[in-house]
UniProtKB/Swiss-Prot annotation:
Its main location: mitochondrion. The twin CX3C motif contains 4 conserved Cys residues that form 2 disulfide bonds in the mitochondrial intermembrane space. However, during the transit of TIMM9 from cytoplasm into mitochondrion, the Cys residues probably coordinate zinc, thereby preventing folding and allowing its transfer across mitochondrial outer membrane. The gene is TIMM9. It comes from Gallus gallus. It comes from the Eukaryota. The lineage of its organism: Eukaryota, Metazoa, Chordata, Craniata, Vertebrata. One of its GO terms (cellular component) is mitochondrial inner membrane. This is Mitochondrial import inner membrane translocase subunit Tim9. It is found in: Mitochondrion inner membrane. Disulfide bonds join 28-52, 32-48. Keywords: Chaperone, Disulfide bond, Membrane, Metal-binding, Mitochondrion, Mitochondrion inner membrane, Protein transport, Translocation, Transport, Zinc. It is a peripheral membrane protein.
Amino acid sequence: MAGQISETDQIKQFKEFLGTYNKITENCFMDCIRDFTTREVKPEEITCSEHCLQKYLKMTQRISMRFQEYHIQQNEALAAKAGLLSQPR
């Protein structure tokens, strides 16, 4: 069945997602949360956490765009090379 992801691959993707989620959570928590004397989250901690997550999401988006651009360039180069090789001399 084309286009469907196997259960094994779905589990693998979910594990990768959880690993990424846990890493982001830990990094932002370590960077932003400083006061453990109260149960309340301070406004500056909330702001820091939001900025931390936004920064990660923007970075991920930028990397994905660059990765996609790279693959497009590679595919174009391969297509051009294949076109040159298939032309009669």
